[in-house]
Amino acid sequence: MAHIYRPKHHVRFVTASSLFDGHDASINIMRRILQASGAEVIHLGHNRSVEEIVNAAIQEDVQGIAVSSYQGGHMEFFKYMYDLLQERGASHIRIYGGGGGVIIPREIKELHEYGIARIFSPEDGRRLGLQGMINVMLEECDFPTVTVVTDELERLPSGDVQAIARLITLCEYRAEGENKEAAAAAEAAIEQVKALEKRVPVLGITGTGGAGKSSLTDELVRRFLNEIPDIKIAILSVDPTKQKTGGALLGDRIRMNSINSPRVYMRSLATRHSRTELSPAIRDAISVVKAAGFDLVIIETSGIGQGDAAITEVCDVSMYVMTSEFGAPTQLEKIDMIDYADLIVINKFERKGSEDAKRQVQKQYQRSHQLFDRDVSEMPVYGTIASQFNDPGTNTLFVALVDTINKKAGTNWKTSLKTVANVEKHNVIIPNERRYYLREIAETVRSYHRRAEQQVEVARRLFQIEGAIEAAKERGEAEDVIRALETLKADYEAKLTPESKRILATWEETKAKYAAKQFVTKVRDKEIVTELTTKTLSGLDIPKVVLPKFKDYGEILRWVYKENVPGSFPYTAGVFPFKRQGEDPKRQFAGEGTPERTNRRFHYLCKEDKAKRLSTAFDSVTLYGEDPDYRPDIFGKVGESGVSVCTLDDMKKLYKGFDLCDPLTSVSMTINGPAPILLAMFMNTAIDQQVEKKEAELGRPLTPEEYEQVKEWTLQTVRGTVQADILKEDQGQNTCIFSTDFALKMMGDIQEYFIKHRVRNYYSVSISGYHIAEAGANPITQLAFTLANGFTYVEYYLSRGMHIDDFAPNLSFFFSNGLDPEYSVIGRVARRIWAIVMREKYGANERSQKLKYHIQTSGRSLHAQEIDFNDIRTTLQALLAIYDNCNSLHTNAYDEAITTPTEESVRRAMAIQLIITKEFGLTKNENPLQGSFIIEELTDLVEEAVLQEFERLNDRGGVLGAMEMQYQRGKIQDESLYYETKKHTGELPIIGVNTFLNPNPPSEDELNNIQLARATYEEKETQIRNLREFQERNKDKAGPALERLKQVATSGGNIFEELMETVKVASLGQITRALYEVGGQYRRNM
């Protein structure tokens, strides 16, 4: 067991992932170990700007900041953070960081010299281990932030943030009495603070754990800021201390979107030794913020039990937050806060039974307060859905809250918000009556297999009876014996279903077809002739598809029901009869710097290919829906790890020279949060391209009617995929930017637009497990969560009135391939489950039953140590994907562990695929996995494990209910920690990383000389200049266009249809900000 350093002082850390960076797996592991080692951790989550991190660190009076940065731009990010701390007089706060192999030794050295306390490298991780790195951080930060009072009291009345923070820390020292020197200084200071106190209302918010107090607090703060001019708010948020370790997770900040305002101060406090829901320093802390000139103090407690009501002793107005899940009505009689609270909130009011719960609470409140002369409906009990943007129930609560504060505290605040009698969910994703869909799906698959197995037993008996008849005839048995057997045979034949009879009747014909020289198939009324054998150098004919040599009817049925030939239900071996000739599944990502630079890379990648299969990686600024800017933490990320695209002009430059409507051209875009905006830019690019061709052909501008014809033809012809999978973003990758319901609404709008305009060749979503795997999930979890997400989209689109066969063909999937054994069958299991469910449960047609998926080799399996070995891993993963008949494949470059791929590394990655498909002999056969005992066993094992995961998700309220409970994220993080622990202990051997180590490791100079693909300063400047030129050119049109977009969104219209127009005159960042106003920002979860 590793030694754990236990700090002598209360060490506090702010932890986060850097701006435009969703890779939070490692920082979550770090913050967990920090807590377990005794630190108080204020976790901000992913995608945090330097400004947000520094503000939080100063307000929280921490000793250290720990940030992970995996998306490039780290030099600017960390230096800017250091500079900002110096500028704001907080030079004592130490900065720690890490980014795997992305931050190379010379950059680490430069950052250390600049003043960053420590940037941990993969070598540090190997040498020190996870706990060892945490020990270094704790030991270096084990000091008090304040011991004496200097000029804090003079700076306090002006609201100086550092003065407030330091004085609250002194309040904590005073309450504990452990630091005698600090406690004495605090004693004197607090007496002076009390003399400066003003009369300020204090709102206390308390409630059960998990009731949504932080989200509700954030929504109330947003309304206070919007409704009451110039109001200044202080929030004191309390979370429990772990008595065993002394550590605490102070997690309320992560839920707050409204606090990044100069009018808001927030401080997180741990309960430490108080043994209640409040910090022992809470009264003194309230005095400090009152003296600092705030107009409202909000106290949010940790989760409480039935008998807790301490909040009422320190506030003027108290609010109790609960949900409908309190058990029997008699339980309400035990809740002290119902006796004391001024306002009671039933949050998460969309849940079943909330209306009944509200009435029960109203009755209990009426009894507790002896208000029998008033109608029960007048009791101050309010239903809210705080997670819903601009929730009418929260508006009604806010109006009542302002009225209560005015009455009890003598304020004269006004609000223009309207009240409602009934609270409803605006955009219901899964209707209540469909909430058990995942359990139904699991049962559908098992039922199919049970029926198949029953048919197998019938067919086997039939085969045995036929054999007995034949044997009896050969021996010359009596006619009555043979008649009895014939009768028995007829009985068993009658038990066969028509489908089973058809399979058996056509089996020999099927075998004959595949034994022929050629095979003719039809795809969309077009005949395709396929040669069925390939001659080896030795002169043997290798068949494309091999069928089993079964004679037993039972074995034939089992094989067809569970496996079947590629292109036939249940599509276990593949959704098409044969691979497409002349178009390998090869697809290579590109994305770096400016659109012009990436365009050149695209042309380089496919210069020798007839088929142009382009996959686009966007930089993190684009992934988060923002525009390039000179601010250092943004500037450093522009064009790093992807291409910068923020206008329609950029999109046109990106695909210049490619005919986007050529049947051999296909474009995939890896974009999620702002996907509707980028997709609108892409579709406009394709349309404008065809319009220009048509106008050149005609020698004149098109008429409006001709333009519409070209537009419709383009939409129906263009091929490609946009990722746009918002569920997996919340669960794993974290590039969510809009509130989840609003983001899903836009996904549905895209699909409705596709149906209306008959977009048949473009996938509206790529339901992705890749990023779930990259965040740390094992292969079974990846597959289960991804398929569950897919079925959730199916249920949502059906609830919007779309027909299954109108949208299912627009759904595609995306998986990772690692080296675990389960990856050998990930495609087989996915195809079989999808096909069975689509046919048996949803009544979908053949096209809708076919699950098509892209594979990318595992990025997580690429290691910064011995990077040359990565190509070996990638080769094995690519081989698995090709054996399993994936529809499209991207092979990672070996140097992606440390940089955006270079031309040399990309060429090697492409060669891996080419060698497998062109040189490796067994790939001439297209069903090499069929007939393998281990593959069949693994397929069944993985399928059942996936169905069990569906049931676990179902029991938590389906995919969305589980997301609310953080089930998926928690499971992914647990599996990530398990993997990392095994890797660090060496139990999981990783060649070149923890075993078979290089006896002559590369020197620091050699590591520093590795070629890195980075965007240049000039490229970043070019993007900003181009953006501003676009905005200037459209300055008169952008405002009205954005207003129209907001109007469509608020009126429930099709947002994507309007975006097709908006993108012509507004930039990505402008559109994103407009949509935030009407749809709300994503709220991070712990």
UniProtKB/Swiss-Prot annotation:
Protein residues bound to adenosylcob(III)alamin: 23
Binding annotation for Mg(2+) 2: 238-239, 252, 300-301
One Pfam match: MeaB
Segments forming domain B12-binding: 10-140
Region named Linker: 408-570
The reaction(s) this protein catalyses: 2-methylpropanoyl-CoA = butanoyl-CoA; 3-methylbutanoyl-CoA = 2,2-dimethylpropanoyl-CoA; GTP + H2O = GDP + phosphate + H(+)
Protein name per the record: Fused isobutyryl-CoA mutase
Phylogenetic lineage: Bacteria, Bacillati, Bacillota, Bacilli, Bacillales
Recorded name of the encoding gene: icmF
